[in-house]
């Protein structure tokens, strides 16, 4: 099984609507970001049906190695807890709607599976994508170490066809979840240096 999963991973892509790049992955660790995008990979073009993902496959998709099952299960729980704190917002004038991306999330240690389903109101984020989307190889993302690098990577992938990406500093702070206490010297040292080194 190990070889089959690794072969699958080499060409696995993540595709989603660009609007998901507006949702900062607040407080996610590097490992949790990898798991999240591994889930997005498995849920793409699955409409709203419930998807069962074997632990072993998700571990390989998210480049998750050298950890105990107990730690893996805890990380799966942390991912969903953090996802619940993230909301997807649609605005129209002063009116708005808020949603969470995944409505079902069951970790079954006995069968070694994660069972997950997408919110029907957000199925367009991962399904029937024809325009205004971000696409990247999952393997490229999971080999980055810094959370800032991972988040910048997905933003840059959105703009790969234009050849440039321009952003105001306040938006940059928001999208990369940079602490408000960081001055420009901190941003250069703790955010930009890892990004430049890894990308």
Segments from the language model and where they lie:
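Charged, alpha-helix-forming regions
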Residues: 1-198
């Amino acid at each position: 099984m190990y070889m089959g999963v690794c072969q699958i991973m080499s060409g696995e892509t993540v595709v989603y609507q660009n609007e998901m790049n507006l949702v900062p992955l607040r407080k996610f660790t590097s490992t949790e970001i990898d798991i999240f995008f591994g889930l997005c990979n498995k849920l793409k073009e699955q409409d709203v049906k419930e998807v069962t993902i074997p632990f072993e496959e998700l571990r390989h998709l998210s480049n998750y190695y050298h950890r105990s099952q107990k730690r893996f299960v805890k990380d799966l729980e942390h991912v969903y807890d953090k996802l619940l704190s993230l909301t997807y917002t649609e605005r129209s004038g002063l009116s708005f709607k808020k949603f969470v991306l995944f409505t079902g999330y069951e970790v079954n240690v006995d069968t070694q599976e994660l069972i997950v389903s997408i919110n029907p109101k957000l199925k367009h984020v991962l399904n029937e994508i024809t325009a205004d989307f971000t696409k990247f190889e999952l393997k490229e993302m999971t080999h980055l170490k810094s959370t800032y690098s991972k988040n910048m990577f997905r933003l840059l992938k959105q703009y790969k066809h234009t050849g440039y990406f321009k952003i105001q500093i306040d938006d940059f702070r928001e999208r990369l979840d940079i602490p408000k206490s960081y001055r420009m010297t901190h941003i250069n040292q703790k955010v930009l240096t890892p990004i430049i080194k890894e990308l």
